[in-house]
Amino acid sequence: MYFSQEEWELLDPTQKALYNDVMQENYETVISLALFVLPKPKVISCLEQGEEPWVQVSPEFKDSAGKSPTGLKLKNDTENHQPVSLSDLEIQASAGVISKKAKVKVPQKTAGKENHFDMHRVGKWHQDFPVKKRKKLSTWKQELLKLMDRHKKDCAREKPFKCQECGKTFRVSSDLIKHQRIHTEEKPYKCQQCDKRFRWSSDLNKHLTTHQGIKPYKCSWCGKSFSQNTNLHTHQRTHTGEKPFTCHECGKKFSQNSHLIKHRRTHTGEQPYTCSICRRNFSRRSSLLRHQKLHL
């Protein structure tokens, strides 16, 4: 598959990189067939050297004899041969090998042509080659464009699931459902020992260690023990003064990520906590709890 200069300039960097990978993979696949003598095509050399691989005139694979831009030649041990178009060779898409039922159209002989395909022992393909899901090489351009489009969408990391309360978007619906607990104050995970409830199962598991009394993580500064290693690291910042979390809006630093998240709401105006009675919104949970006492 080849691009003219105009076509090449329309591709973005991601598409060009993908084209590079696909073309070199296809070249290596053909080599692995051991059916061709392969002088390296100019387009592959350009890709390896980091040069732009566009051509002056975008060639198309033909069903008739003539020049082929790939420069591939079938292995040949006879002088009497006929040129064969690469587009007529059917290659199995999934396994990357030529099918035992590959159809080869042999056009009228045209002598003296360079960079064409010489047919050798037509039809004597290995009988053990699989036959399923064959695709012609002439469809590579369409397949590549489809692959580029799919890859571009994946890179964009589309997030179709949107929270109606704060506008935050998510890639999967399950993440949206979990996020919405922030607004609804839903806490589906309950401790069977003290009836305390939690929004996340991970928080419940951490809480259960407080009942077990196991605190294997000890601060070397003050001797205080913790049930979770993360809690120990957070605590140690009170001794070291470390503040690794930085607000990119104002440059203010924080020792805990949760403190940074709360601070960011002063810039974004986000108010994720909603009163279930009057629907008023708050940026901090503590503010919501104080407000709810007014309804009692």
Swiss-Prot record:
May be involved in transcriptional regulation. It holds the Pfam family KRAB. The gene is ZNF75A. This is Zinc finger protein 75A. GO terms for molecular function: DNA-binding transcription factor activity, RNA polymerase II-specific; RNA polymerase II transcription regulatory region sequence-specific DNA binding; sequence-specific double-stranded DNA binding; zinc ion binding. A zinc finger (C2H2-type) spans 161-183, 189-211, 217-239, 245-267, 273-295. One of its GO terms (biological process) is regulation of transcription by RNA polymerase II. It comes from the Eukaryota. The keyword Ligase does not apply. Keywords: DNA-binding, Metal-binding, Nucleus, Repeat, Transcription, Transcription regulation, Zinc, Zinc-finger. Residues 1-66 form the KRAB domain. One of its GO terms (cellular component) is nucleus. It is found in: Nucleus. SMART domains: KRAB, ZnF_C2H2. Belongs to the krueppel C2H2-type zinc-finger protein family.
